[in-house]
């Protein structure tokens, strides 16, 4: 994997949870910008799967990128959802799962933009995805584009919000990881489970989507190899 940036005048910050999607984005950013030009921002917001914070810290250190941890746990006092309530059952409520955290991605993008401007960084990368967005309205492309305009106007600064996974299925995200040469790394070191089970519970929506995508990708890869 290329670790030097052909455009050394640009830097990027990745919104980083230590999960499959954001770690894939981080590896792509390292390839595109160079490891010396990439930082990550991680958020502690009272998530029940706090093990992701440990994973994020370990991965950032392992890859040699600067990590900034931002505490936004105040959100836990003003909204309720199954992602922050350890006693709540994870289930679907209408078209939106009860794991949806109102305002989370808007808050993450705002805080990251504030940090990025202070560092002279314009490119902000987030792993949100519309194809497998699970009913989360703040994972849609229309939201990201709207937020990009809002942040630019609010801070009189030219941010570029980048969403490399926006139109990829989970299987295609696994394919991207494989193309980057980090499929096994993503499988072994990232955390996705909403329940906070280190190797995954295999039952929550996030685990199901991750495993389904992996099976689909490995199956299609195997078929392609047979056809060659």
From Swiss-Prot:
SUPFAM superfamilies assigned: Adenine nucleotide alpha hydrolases-like
EC number assigned by the record: 6.3.4.20
Sequence positions that bind Zn(2+): 193, 201, 204, 207
The keyword ATP-binding is annotated on this UniProt entry: yes
Cofactor note: Binds 1 zinc ion per subunit.
Enzymatic reactions: 7-carboxy-7-deazaguanine + NH4(+) + ATP = 7-cyano-7-deazaguanine + ADP + phosphate + H2O + H(+)
Pathway: Purine metabolism; 7-cyano-7-deazaguanine biosynthesis
Pfam families tied to this protein: QueC
UniProt entry keywords in alphabetical sequence: ATP-binding, Ligase, Metal-binding, Nucleotide-binding, Queuosine biosynthesis, Zinc
Cofactor(s) for this UniProt protein: Zn(2+)
One Gene Ontology term from the biological process aspect of the record: queuosine biosynthetic process
Residues that bind ATP: 16-26
MF-aspect GO terms: ATP binding; ligase activity, forming carbon-nitrogen bonds; zinc ion binding
Broadest EC class assigned to this enzyme: ligase
Family membership: Belongs to the QueC family.
NCBIfam families reported for this sequence: 7-cyano-7-deazaguanine synthase QueC
Function: Catalyzes the ATP-dependent conversion of 7-carboxy-7-deazaguanine (CDG) to 7-cyano-7-deazaguanine (preQ(0)).
Name this protein carries in UniProt: 7-cyano-7-deazaguanine synthase
Organism this protein belongs to: Pasteurella multocida (strain Pm70)
Organism lineage string: Bacteria, Pseudomonadati, Pseudomonadota, Gammaproteobacteria, Pasteurellales
